[in-house]
Design a protein with these regions (language model features):
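N-terminal nucleophile
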Residues: 1-153
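Conserved small/polar residues in nucleotide/adenosyl-binding loops
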Residues: 154-159
């Protein structure tokens, strides 16, 4: 098999670090950092620096950080769209996240995931990949960590 046809096992791993936060006054924020796609075309800009695609925050809806194949996240303005569904259609954050990731993104054969939070403390994550590293720190100092698409998270008490 020619080398060009062999796919690296790491070809679909993303190196994105995302964060969403809620302060005690109900203000929310999001941040996204990425190393980008391996062997990308010169001049390619991914979704992370594009507000509304890979990162978005509005105290009227939600704060969101996303990771995945950037071209699809840009095309769908994934971050803004999830928050718009919460603000204008009244969907819960989890419903909005799942609709965009599992319906809209998958219909374009895009892959990735997101984390998001609302000013009232709803927290959601959604992904259509085998796993997505994620963690949650509660107000009481309880740390929850997850990798795969299961409901059980590792619970750690922070001191």
């Amino acid at each position: 098999m020619p080398v060009a046809e062999i796919e690296s096992p790491d070809a679909h791993k993303f190196g994105t670090v995302g964060v969403v936060a809620l302060d005690r006054e109900g203000n929310i924020a999001a941040g996204t950092s990425t190393g980008g796609t391996q062997a990308k075309r010169w001049g390619r800009v991914g979704d992370s620096p594009i507000i509304g695609a890979g990162t978005y925050a509005s105290n009227q809806s939600c704060a969101l950080s996303a990771t995945g194949t950037g071209e699809y996240f840009i095309r769908l303005t994934v971050a803004r769209e999830v928050c718009a569904l919460v603000q204008y259609k009244g969907l819960t954050l989890q419903q909005a996240a799942d609709q965009i990731i599992h319906k809209e993104l998958e219909s374009l054969h895009g892959d990735g995931g997101l984390i998001a939070i609302t000013p009232d403390g709803q927290l959601a994550w959604s992904f259509n990949t085998p796993g997505m590293f994620r963690a949650k720190l509660t107000e009481g100092g309880k740390l929850q960590i997850g990798i795969y698409n299961d409901l059980s998270l590792i619970h750690i008490r922070c001191v």
